[in-house]
Amino acid sequence: MNAMRLTSSAPSLRQHTITAPAPAWRHPDHIVLETCVEDIEGVRISARAGADRAELCDNLTAAGTTPSIGTIEAAIFAAAEQVEQRRAQAGPYWADKADAAAPFGLRVIIRPRGGSFVYDADEGRAMIADVRRIASLALEMAEFTRPQATGGGRGQLPPAVDLGFVVGALTEDGTIDRGLVRLLVDMANGAPVTFHRAFDQCRDTVEAYGDLEGLGVRYVLTSGAAQTAADGASVIAGLVASGGPTVVAAGAVRPHGLVDLVESTGVREVHMRCPRECMTPDEPKRTDEALVRRAVEAVRTVPLPE
């Protein structure tokens, strides 16, 4: 699809509490854990159990589609409540404590349907409209999620929720749809944007990675174009070494394999599903809090790569 001829003023997120956090809170001293969830309770569990971020999707049976505005709003509240509880437990000077100060990252997938990642003009416009509406929602909710603690009165307090977007779009020939991705990043207007595993379907991942850096994408979710992150470790390692957007390893990532994955790739961020076992095929795949806690414990103990 060619670059779309669409202009619109996106609401600014930069001066509100639901934004990308200031650099002081952006780089934890541990491997970052991002969960993948498809409901509000999954966001709440992830924040309560100590995960750093959650990707919020609908319809994970189709690899994730855009959740409703109502679901996103409720998820922001759920995450903010957990962060405020953590900060309240840390006391009035919580802003001086890294674990308490860190916002919870909520990444909303923007994907109008399952299937291929090649979109026509109508689908592209729908994706841009979704980013615009969610950005507007963030502004509306900013006052409701403003930090309550004083943090000692020094400097700007971190937000409770670091809201961002997960996008992905390809052309028919397996390259990044630069026109559409640029419009989506522009509409996010400063909020962090992740390019999802459509990346693994690119004909040339090195070229695609360079394109995404030029488009302002901050994170790339990838298995190294393999079935699992472990199988794609060499590709992931090459991307990490090139120093572009932050690489988030995904694809059958499990707590017991984190040490080997980090050592073989150099990644500092991982993405994993933590589903509860289902009794029937039709039962929704809820998030398993015990599994999230095991994953959190694992990422806190794995040494950071040099």
Regions found by a protein language model. Name each.
Residues 2-36, 93-99:
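N-terminal amphipathic alpha-helix/helix-capping segment at the start of soluble metabolic enzymes
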Residues 13, 111-115, 143-144, 153-157, ...:
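C-terminal alpha-helical cap/extension of soluble enzyme domains
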Residues 22-25, 73-84, 95-100, 135, ...:
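Surface-exposed amphipathic alpha-helices with a cationic face
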Residues 31-35, 54-56, 106-110, 165-167, ...:
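Hydrophobic faces of well-ordered beta-strands that scaffold small-molecule active sites
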Residues 38-45, 116-136, 203-215, 239-243, ...:
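Catalytic cores of alpha/beta
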Residues 40-41, 60-82, 122, 171-187, ...:
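Active-site-adjacent beta->alpha loops and helix N-cap segments on the catalytic face
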Residues 47-54, 79, 102, 159-162, ...:
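Glycine-enriched alpha-helix->loop->beta-strand junction motifs that scaffold or abut catalytic
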Residues 68-86, 93-179:
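Glycine/small-residue-rich loop that forms an oxyanion/phosphate-binding "nest" at active or ligand-binding sites
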